[in-house]
């Protein structure tokens, strides 16, 4: 798309790959000018520290853009469009199976609309179709077994902290 807009080939490259191999090579290479990373705080801080070190043949300071494990919230007030709030929260929380830096991880809801909002979110989530995303399902698998185990551990933490869990886990 960038090339179609007139950008010369190779100026911007999207290069997904294993962080332990491809990612480390990019961070360490003396000709890398900018590193954009989305992931854990631990890995992001490591990338930042390594990018700050100069290497033989490096002629500029590397820049970093680091999006690291945040807690994205949505505020639902009594005067909001409740239908839009429900759709927005469900899309933000469950889009890409929650595997994105902007996944909504909490909703702060005014008492006056709390029960109605919760019920509508519950209904909307229960209507999500689980399956192969290539077949128009709302939710598919997470990226790997490690991600699944992390999600399951978060659920257990939430239960242990007395957090409200309103839906059953679907484990295929």
Question: What are the language-model segments listed below?
Answer:
Residues 1, 169-172:
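Accessible peptide chain termini
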Residues 37:
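Phosphate/diphosphate-binding loops
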């Amino acid at each position: 798309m960038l090339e179609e807009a007139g950008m010369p080939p190779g100026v911007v490259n999207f290069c997904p790959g294993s962080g332990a191999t491809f990612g480390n090579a990019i961070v360490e290479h003396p000709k890398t000018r900018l590193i954009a990373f989305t992931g854990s705080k631990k890995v992001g801080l490591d990338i930042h520290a390594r990018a700050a070190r100069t290497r033989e043949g490096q002629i500029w300071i590397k820049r970093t853009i680091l999006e690291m494990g945040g807690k994205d919230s949505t505020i639902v007030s009594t005067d909001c469009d409740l239908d839009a709030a429900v759709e927005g929260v469900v899309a933000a929380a469950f889009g890409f199976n929650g595997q994105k830096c902007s996944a909504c991880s909490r909703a702060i809801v005014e008492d006056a609309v709390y029960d109605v909002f919760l019920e509508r979110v519950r209904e909307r989530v229960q209507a999500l179709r689980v399956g192969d995303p290539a077949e128009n399902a709302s939710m598919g698998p997470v990226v790997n077994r490690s991600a699944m185990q992390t999600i399951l551990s978060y659920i257990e933490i939430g239960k242990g902290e007395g957090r409200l869990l309103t839906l059953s886990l679907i484990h295929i």
